[in-house]
């Protein structure tokens, strides 16, 4: 039996044990995991230092290095995320009554775990803790296949979580990291449809496409974040500037950072000079259409096909539009169904934008950086789904469960 088959079968067996574990017991384990992460920071940081050293030697991008790096504050944030998950309602076991049929049978639906989730991600060691805890609370076993860049960090975090599982006499296979980053093993993992119920890839376009093209298991894509801010003709100048700077410069290497700016032509002469100075002060590189270039000391004029890039750095694409519909057309063509924002004082424009834009999260007068499970009240998220089945947007506990029908009768038979 191969390593991958062994891991998948062990996870399936472990998931059956977890499915019957009560909420109080799960919360006890999770609280212990949170404490253990804080207590074992030294070993986790040492493993992360090895990953960072190798990543720098391999000239990993600044955005990837930012995602890879752990600090005491980030480890505490992982632990805090688990504490939040403890405080959330357990969806498993929730029952929804559908009524009694004319023949007397009673129909209801019961929320149950998916079973075994496979998480495939790149240089994001925090995903190991977030996904492990979310899957555990929602009753699922999880197989974690992180990128080679974060392997030592992911193994160190998983080791801490598995120590807690052993302490509570639970199988380690509930949270497993694939110990070898060989892509051939990932391909084998994607064939395990008898033992894995769902694959969730988080990473760059190449990884997402590889998983989607090669998986025999259902996939929920967590695709790139080409997020736009549209500054409407009625926008408040200061609000729009704050949304732009927070969305673009607070943290550039994340999927909910702004990559595109659309400005109504009527407000451009007033607002773009202010935005240009603020972006210059932050060192943001400007790419734009010809109509906007005059507002910037240095700018690269883009051809039509060059819009829609995910920069993940201090760089942005800017375009003027003559109406709300043109802004929505641009987003439909170049957006990635992640997060889109309008800044406007016109309620009708906000409603049209939020109803008409096809994205997992559509915001009015709020920063794109709020497109995050913890900020939206879900606790630590397993990712932001950009496909519509079976979840769309930040995925919390409920998205890691499904429903089955329960039918109760008194001996009725079908005529």
Where are these regions (language model features)?
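NAD(P)-dependent aldehyde/semialdehyde dehydrogenase
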Residues: 265-367
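N-terminal Rossmann-like NAD(P)+-binding subdomain of aldehyde/semialdehyde dehydrogenases
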Residues: 1-107
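C-terminal core of ALDH-fold dehydrogenases
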Residues: 28, 329-414
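ALDH superfamily catalytic-core signature
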Residues: 2, 123-126, 130-138, 160, ...
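Flexible, glycine/charged-enriched surface loops at secondary-structure junctions
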Residues: 23-27, 168-175, 252-258, 285-291, ...
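Rossmann-like NAD(P) dinucleotide-binding subdomain of oxidoreductase/dehydrogenase enzymes
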Residues: 87, 95-234, 238
């Amino acid at each position: 039996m191969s390593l991958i088959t062994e891991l998948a079968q062990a996870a399936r067996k472990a998931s059956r044990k977890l499915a019957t574990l009560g909420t109080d017991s799960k919360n006890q384990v999770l609280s212990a995991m949170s404490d253990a992460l804080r207590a074992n920071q030294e070993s986790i940081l040492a493993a992360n230092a090895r990953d960072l050293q190798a990543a720098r030697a391999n000239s990993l991008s600044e955005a990837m290095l930012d995602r890879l790096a752990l600090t005491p504050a980030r480890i505490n944030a992982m632990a805090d995320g688990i504490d939040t998950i403890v405080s959330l309602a357990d969806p498993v076991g929730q029952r929804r009554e559908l009524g009694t049929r004319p023949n007397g049978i009673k129909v209801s639906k019961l929320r149950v775990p998916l079973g075994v989730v496979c998480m495939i991600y790149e240089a994001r060691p925090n995903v190991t803790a977030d996904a492990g805890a979310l899957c555990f609370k929602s009753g699922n076993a999880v197989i974690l296949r992180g990128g080679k860049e974060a392997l030592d960090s992911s193994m160190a975090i998983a080791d801490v979580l598995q120590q807690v599982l052993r302490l509570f006499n639970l199988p380690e296979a509930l949270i497993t990291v694939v110990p070898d980053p060989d892509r051939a093993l990932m391909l084998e993992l994607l064939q395990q449809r008898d033992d894995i119920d769902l694959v969730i890839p988080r990473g760059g376009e190449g990884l997402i496409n590889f998983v989607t093209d090669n998986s025999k298991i259902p996939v929920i894509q967590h695709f790139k974040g080409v997020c736009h801010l549209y500054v409407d003709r009625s926008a408040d100048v200061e609000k729009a500037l704050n949304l732009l700077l927070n969305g673009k410069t607070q943290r550039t290497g994340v999927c909910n950072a702004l990559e595109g700016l659309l400005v109504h032509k009527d407000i451009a002469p007033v607002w773009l000079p202010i935005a240009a100075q603020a972006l210059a002060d932050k060192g943001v590189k400007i790419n734009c259409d010809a109509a906007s270039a005059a507002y910037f000391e240095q700018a690269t004029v883009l051809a039509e096909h060059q819009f829609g890039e995910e920069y993940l750095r201090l760089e942005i694409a800017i375009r003027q539009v003559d109406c709300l519909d043109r802004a929505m057309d641009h987003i439909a063509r170049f957006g990635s169904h992640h997060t889109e924002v309008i800044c406007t004082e016109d309620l009708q424009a906000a409603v049209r934008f939020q109803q008409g834009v096809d994205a997992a999260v559509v915001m009015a007068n709020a920063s794109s950086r709020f497109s995050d499970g913890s900020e939206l009240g879900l606790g630590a998220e397993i990712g932001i789904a950009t496909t519509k089945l079976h979840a769309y947007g930040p995925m919390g506990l409920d998205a890691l469960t499904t429903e089955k029908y329960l039918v109760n009768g008194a001996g009725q038979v079908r005529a």
